[in-house]
A protein has these predicted regions:
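Long, intrinsically disordered low-complexity tandem-repeat regions enriched in serine/threonine/proline
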Residues: 1-48
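Arg/Lys-rich, positively charged N-terminal/basic patches that mediate binding to nucleic acids
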Residues: 56-58
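Low-complexity, intrinsically disordered or signal/transmembrane-proximal segments
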Residues: 60-63
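N-terminal and secondary-structure boundary signal
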Residues: 66-341
Length: 341
């Protein structure tokens, strides 16, 4: 459904396993490491201004990830540079692209997340459609892990999921929320698995998100695959490939872990959803003997890259990976079925 009025839709302009792509817990609050905010002078700084304060040291202290160790600020990155790098990486003009981005990996982006969205749209062209995993900042089905006081307060006054208003999950960076609020954007009506899309195919990709099996065969993720879409990790880690949840959902394997949860939905009342478990994992990956602290989605993605499924390149300062959605899904389904079927 539309989430913003298309006043002038500028034609030029994930995460798997709920793993953050931000440098910290909140990419938009303090975690992206390349936020385009000035080093403001506080009272202490102002008082010491005439005392020879080392402003480079101040910058390092306040914004350590955006300041180079030897020369000061990270290199500036512009919209045109990003767009050209994206074209060189292999984005298909007029295509469907699902994006996972970590701003801090790119460098000091002039214009921040807004510039990134513009550059992605520049590379896709006016016929291209940009998609991002939005989910919801309220992780309702994880309530069993909350303190009893929080559960009671939530049950007393449960927030309603509203596709037009509810904030995208912060742990997946600033781009999904920036895209959600863009004029003409559409968001699917699922509190946990929702996606946001912008472009000519946005409504087609986000309509009728099923309440049961929200990552499955009739989900927006399946439609990205059917549309011959691509998936881009723009500096984001391999484990943030949300499309791999789609592979988990459609793999012919019995005994998948699932979760069922009820959410108040604006205008519709309480609704019950059943999905694969995207937090603990749909399968017992621990039984595979993977190295400790290794995310299985990273293992699958690296295996796909080694098999020639996907390409790796640089956009600005970031190492990036670009996958064909159908090829990645087919590889992941085969990988899962070989080990769990």
């Amino acid at each position: 459904m539309p989430v913003a009025a298309d006043a002038h839709d500028d034609a030029s302009g994930d995460g798997a396993r709920n793993v953050p792509v931000a440098a910290d817990a909140h990419d938009d609050a303090a975690g992206d490491g390349a936020r385009n905010v000035p080093v403001a002078a506080d009272a202490d700084d102002e008082a010491a201004a005439t005392g020879g304060r080392d402003w480079t040291a101040v910058a390092h202290r306040r914004h350590p990830t955006r300041v180079c160790e030897a020369v000061g600020w990270m290199a500036a990155v512009t919209r045109s540079q990003l767009a050209q790098d994206l074209r060189d990486l292999g984005l298909r003009p007029g295509g469907v692209l699902m994006i996972h981005a970590r701003m801090s990996a790119l460098g000091w982006v002039v214009g921040a997340a807004e510039t990134v969205v513009h550059a992605l749209r520049d590379a896709l062209g006016p016929e291209g459609t940009l998609v991002a995993y939005a989910s919801w900042e309220e992780h309702v089905y994880q309530a069993a892990e909350w303190p009893a006081e929080h559960v009671a307060a939530h049950q007393a006054e449960p927030p309603a999921f509203d596709p037009a208003l509810s904030e995208a999950v912060r742990d997946h960076g600033r781009v999904p929320e920036r895209l959600r609020t863009w004029p003409g954007a559409h968001r699917s009506a699922h509190p946990e698995a929702s996606v946001v899309a912008l472009g000519p195919r946005a409504h087609e990709l986000t309509r009728d998100h099923p309440e049961r099996d929200g990552y499955g065969r009739d989900s927006p993720f399946a439609r990205v695959v059917a549309a011959d879409g691509q998936v881009l990790l723009l500096g984001a880690p391999l484990e943030t490939l949300t499309l791999l949840h789609h592979a988990e959902a459609i793999a012919a394997v019995a005994g998948k872990r699932t979760v069922t949860f009820t959410v108040e939905v604006a205008g519709a009342g309480p609704r019950t959803y059943t999905d694969i478990d995207t937090t603990a994992g749909a399968y017992r990956y621990a039984d595979l003997g993977l190295p400790e602290d290794t995310d299985p989605f990273e293992v699958i993605a690296r295996a796909a890259l080694a098999a020639g499924v996907g390409t790796t390149g640089r956009v600005a300062a970031a190492e990036c990976h670009l996958f064909d959605a159908a090829a990645l899904t087919a590889f992941a389904v085969a990988w899962i079925e070989e080990r769990f079927a």
